[in-house]
Amino acid sequence: SVALQVTVDAVSGSAKEKITAAGTVTELV
């Protein structure tokens, strides 16, 4: 369960970073 949660957190974190990066690019454009 802990390992699964860590995986979920890692994927969630990556998604948030991608969304933030996309938002930054959008702001620059």
UniProtKB/Swiss-Prot annotation:
Xref: Pfam families: Ribosomal_L27A
Organism: Streptomyces lividans
Purpose of the protein: Binds to the 23S rRNA.
Source species taxonomy: Bacteria, Bacillati, Actinomycetota, Actinomycetes, Kitasatosporales
Gene3D superfamilies listed in its UniProt record: 3.100.10.10
GO CC term (a single one): ribonucleoprotein complex
Similarity comment text for this entry: Belongs to the universal ribosomal protein uL15 family.
Keywords: Ribonucleoprotein, Ribosomal protein, RNA-binding, rRNA-binding
Listed name of the protein: Large ribosomal subunit protein uL15
Summary of subunit composition and partner proteins: Part of the 50S ribosomal subunit.
GO molecular function: rRNA binding
